[in-house]
Swiss-Prot record:
ATP binds at I10, G11, K12, G13, G14, M15, G16, E17, V18, K33. Residues 4-291 form the Protein kinase domain. It comes from the Bacteria. Its EC number is 2.7.11.1. Together with the serine/threonine kinase Pkn1, may play a role in the specific interactions with host proteins during intracellular growth. GO terms for molecular function: ATP binding; protein serine kinase activity; protein serine/threonine kinase activity. InterPro entries: Kinase-like_dom_sf, Prot_kinase_dom, Protein_kinase_ATP_BS, Ser/Thr_kinase_AS, Ser/Thr_kinase_PknD, TPR-like_helical_dom_sf. It catalyses: L-seryl-[protein] + ATP = O-phospho-L-seryl-[protein] + ADP + H(+); L-threonyl-[protein] + ATP = O-phospho-L-threonyl-[protein] + ADP + H(+). Keywords: ATP-binding, Kinase, Nucleotide-binding, Phosphoprotein, Serine/threonine-protein kinase, Transferase. Autophosphorylated on serine and threonine residues. This is Serine/threonine-protein kinase PknD. Pfam families: Pkinase. Belongs to the protein kinase superfamily. Ser/Thr protein kinase family.
Length: 930
């Protein structure tokens, strides 16, 4: 274990102890599980401990924690895994057992809908495990970990058994070991598993099977649906009595459990194994059927692919012009055909495509009827399908933006593909060969219903396109008529009909939806006429939904208005209010979907608001961000990560789905509502380093209210908590000293007060205080005080830290004092090649020196040599000096502050005190506007 730095213990079980550790070789935090020292001499238990690790290591699935290393020749034996922040399903269930009322956030976490999503992931994992010939044999909530970002992971493979192994390997061994040591473990010589989750035949000694794992899943599902056990075990109770199980809807009528789900769970809990599901795949399929719905479709229209009576064929289009993000050659031209008929409100399209058509790319679109003939066909929804190297990719496109993508490997010999597109109950689905590939929910009123097809060769469509209508839509929605008027921009007529619906359906879903669409109609009308009064009317209409069942729609509507007006602070505030106040309302899913769309929209336009929506999406819809998008986002954030002090001082990389990423996004966006949640999470984990990062961020953003309120809370927490002697990065006493320094800094107290007790601080905390002090001193014309601070702190940090973090401020201090010779001497500490490298601090510092000692034209010439696509905020002044200048719409809150500080120094060196002072005033008055 010498390779790892142990940070603290995070769990303890029957045979093992789990620690949070740091792996310096791979620069990452890991979970290290080792056998208990008092059991390490028992060869049988050691063999079983290693067997658990090897089974887990052989499984590759998102629902199984991968094993990094297994050390069987060390003493004690151990293995390592990724560290996942989260909690067990048992702890979540336990938090709501026998509770009469629940907080809103906990009620949402334990809703039937949320639990079904979790259970589906559990089934997927067990389905995979069974396909590998392995039985878990101890499935229970205590062995299911729920990550902070929607991960669902099955733990503890100590009882797992391969089908090739004899069950006697564990159950028929007689080992005499003190019973007190094994209160929390499966004991050799006894039936393996947890009795409350065992099938009746298993308790009678029958060997484990897939059916017994299915029974355990049934118990878990019953708990999820009812928040209680399917039976109550009493001493002396016979096994047969256990199966007097009540239906879930009878046990928990307030949970509104659908009868279908009740049938599913009762089948999984059948006393007779022959009456249970034959496989986990069958159980999972029924859960999917409930989650997705299974409508009956009736053929209505057949669109003959080459019949001009059915289609209007347009001139060939260059697809890369309209969909630049799609995988198409920029030189390829495609045929575009728009149907002459409009589809139904709930519609299914069926067609068969040749492989050749998919290799070239095929698009199916639902563009608005307005403007289709004038090049606006790409507005609306659609799917783009493309095969490359036996990988079939499906992209969901909205208004020209790719907002979702799914890719899977396909059979290289397959030549035809049956494809179905469904639009039903706000849900868009794409099915390929009867397998659902993509599902998306859209709740805004549809704008038109014509069908568009984009393909290189129409002959690649085998036969015709069949349009089917849902049996559920045979009764026309009362909203269809005003929706048609809205689609044709007949706003007053649409509003009149919507109001009639509101009056006819008071307190019902149809009435609330009509009220929401009145606001949409007013918004569209105001946007078309640039009518400021119209925007106010739209806001007033959305306000009528306040405190109703459809209350989330009030804030969704207001967010749409503020987005059109460019008032992004108010837009985000509206969305956040909906997400916080109404997290249990059914309509909240519409707000979540809109957040995800706005994230893609902002990223595509490179707008500064993208950081805020990335943060919101991580909180409310993390499952909507796939692995390739994660990688893309991390690439976009590379420069910001490099220029963030708390990231630089932490040698482990920033994971996308982590608390540190949330803090990073808060820091650069200036969006701080989630700091409280991060504070509470870090305190629960006793992660003092993370707490220091949070307070540093709040101080740098000028959030004095947070520091004043939560420094007191943290002090009280530390005072009333008994701390164990675990290994930690930063001690509680050091954190308290750091808080005192922060408070002195916010109160503008003396330098001695700010750095009082510095000799007791960790170097990380010293550098945090110095960075905050130096920025404040610089912008307020106290550059000479930076030198005093350097003299105070340099003896407590390493030479490398002094060079990297203190030297740039030392140069800036002498620039403020206009000591050109000293500045040049200090610049000589950098390699001269770094003077022209815009990723280096020396690049900008050299530009400042040129402005001070040489000529302004030379300074502008040097700084304008910065790459226009530079990703490093430290070089923003270079982009500012370039011929094209800088677009502030693309700068986040923190980037705008850094640019003001850089311009402040630059104009000071140029001797332009008027512009310099303007920068200082703007810096001091800079509100955290998005």
């Amino acid at each position: 274990m010498q390779r790892y730095d142990i940070i603290r213990m995070i769990g303890k079980g029957g045979m093992g102890e789990v620690y949070l550790a740091y792996d310096p070789v791979c620069s990452r935090k890991v979970a290290l599980k080792r056998i208990r020292e008092d059991l390490s001499d028992n060869e049988l238990l050691k063999k079983r401990f290693l067997r658990e690790a090897k089974i887990a290591a052989d499984l590759v699935h998102p629902g199984v924690v991968p094993v990094f290393t297994i050390c069987s020749d060390s003493d004690p034996v151990y293995y390592t895994m990724p560290y996942i922040e989260g909690y067990t399903l048992k702890s979540l269930l336990k938090s709501v057992w026998q509770c009469d009322s629940l907080p809103k956030d906990l009620a949402e976490q334990t809703s039937v809908a949320t639990f079904l999503s979790i259970f589906h992931k559990i089934c997927s994992t067990v389905e995979y495990v069974h396909s590998r010939g392995i039985l878990h044999r101890d499935l229970k909530p205590d062995n299911i970990l729920l990550g902070l970002f929607s991960e669902v992971v099955i733990l503890d493979w100590g009882a797992a058994l391969s089908k090739e192994m004899e069950e006697d390997f564990l159950s028929d061994i007689d080992v005499r070991i003190p019973g007190s040591l094994f209160s929390n473990m499966t004991i050799p010589g006894k039936i393996v598993g947890t009795p409350d989750y065992m099938a009746p035949e298993r308790l009678r000694g029958t060997p484990a099977s897939e059916s017994t794992d299915i029974y355990a899943l049934g118990v878990i599902l019953y708990q999820m649906l009812t928040l209680s056990f399917p039976y109550r075990k009493k001493k002396g109770q016979k096994i047969s009595l256990r199966h007097q199980i009540s239906f879930p809807e009878e046990i928990a009528p307030h949970r509104e459990i659908p009868p279908f789900l009740s049938q599913v769970v009762m089948r999984a809990l059948a006393a007779d194994p022959r009456e249970r599901y034959r496989s986990v795949s069958a159980l999972k399929a029924d859960i999917e059927q409930h989650l997705q719905g299974s409508p009956e479709w009736t053929p209505k229209i057949v669109l003959h692919t080459q019949d001009r009576e059915c289609w209007k064929f347009h001139e060939p289009i260059l697809l890369s012009k309209y969909f630049p993000m799609l995988e198409v050659s920029p030189a390829l031209w495609y045929s575009l055909a728009i149907s002459k008929i409009e589809s139904f409100s709930e519609v299914r399209l069926e067609y068969t495509l040749l492989r050749k058509g998919l290799e070239e790319g095929f698009g199916i679109l639902l563009p608005p009827s307005e403007g289709v003939d004038h090049g606006d066909f790409y507005h609306g929804y659609g799917f783009w399908l493309h095969i490359k190297e036996n990988i079939l990719s499906v992209s969901l496109v909205k208004n020209g933006l790719e907002i979702q993508k799914t890719s899977r490997h396909i059979d290289g010999n397959k030549e035809k593909f049956f494809i179905a597109f469904e639009k039903q109950n706000h849900r868009l689905s794409l099915i390929i060969d009867n397998i659902v590939w993509t599902i998306h929910m859209d709740y805004l009123p549809a704008r038109g219903g014509r069908i568009g097809v984009i393909i290189q060769d129409v002959a690649d469509v085998c036969g015709n396109i069949v349009v089917l209508e849902s049996s559920g839509s045979l009764q026309v929605s009362c909203l269809a008529v005003p929706d048609a008027f809205l689609n044709e921009k007949l706003y007053e007529r649409a509003i009149t009909f919507y109001r009639r619906i509101v009056e006819s359906f008071p307190g019902r879903k149809e009435g609330y939806e009509a009220q929401f669409r009145i606001g949409i109609a007013l918004l569209e009308k105001a946007s078309e006429n640039s009518d400021s009064e119209g925007f106010i009317q739209a806001l007033e209409e959305f306000s009528t939904l306040h405190n109703s069942v459809a209350a989330p729609l009030e804030y969704l509507g207001k967010a749409l208005v503020y987005q059109r007006l460019g008032e992004y602070n108010e837009e985000v505030k509206s969305l956040l209010l909906a997400l916080k106040r109404y997290c249990q309302r059914p309509e909240i899913s519409r707000v979540r979907d809109h957040v995800v769309y706005r994230l893609h929209e902002a990223l595509y336009s490179n707008h500064r608001i993208s950081l805020v929506f990335m943060l919101l999406a991580l909180h409310v819809a993390p499952e909507s961000i796939n692995a390739s998008e994660e990688e893309h986002f991390l690439q976009n954030l590379h420069g910001k990560i490099q220029d963030t002090l708390f990231c630089n001082l932490d040698i482990s990389p920033v994971d996308f789905r982590s608390s540190k990423m949330e803090l990073l996004l808060s820091y650069w966006s200036g969006f701080t509502p989630f700091l409280l949640g991060l504070f509470q999470r870090s305190w629960d984990l006793k992660d003092y380093r993370a707490l220091a990062d949070i307070f540093y961020t709040a101080a740098d953003l000028g959030n004095k209210e947070f520091i004043e309120e939560y420094s007191g809370i943290l002090r009280e927490n530390i005072r009333t908590t008994t701390f164990s002697k675990e290994i930690v990065e930063i001690l509680p006493d050091q954190l308290l000293c750091f808080l005192s320094g922060l408070e002195a800094l916010t109160l503008q107290e003396s330098i001695e007060k700010v750095f009082d007790g510095i000799e007791n601080l960790d170097p990380v905390l010293i550098l945090y205080l110095f960075d905050l002090f130096a920025k404040d001193a610089l912008i307020h014309g106290r550059g000479e005080e930076i030198l005093k601070a350097i003299a105070l702190v340099e003896k407590y940090i390493s030479p490398q830290q002094r060079y990297r973090y203190l030297l740039p401020y030392e140069v800036l201090s002498y620039l403020w004092m206009k000591d050109a010779n000293k500045v040049y001497d200090l610049l000589s500490s950098y390699d001269e090649s770094s003077w022209i490298d815009d990723s280096s601090h020396a690049f900008v510092l050299y530009g400042y020196w040129l402005a001070l000692a040489e000529d302004s034209s030379l300074a502008y010439l040097h700084l304008s040599g910065c790459r226009e696509d530079s990703v490093f905020p430290r070089a923003l002044i270079g982009v500012f000096c370039s011929p094209l200048g800088i677009c502030e719409e693309q700068l986040s809150y923190q980037e705008r502050r850094q640019l003001l500080l850089q311009k402040f120094i630059f104009f000071h060196c140029l001797g332009n005190s008027e512009e310099r002072d303007k920068c200082r005033t703007a810096y001091d008055s800079k509100e955290r506007s998005l």
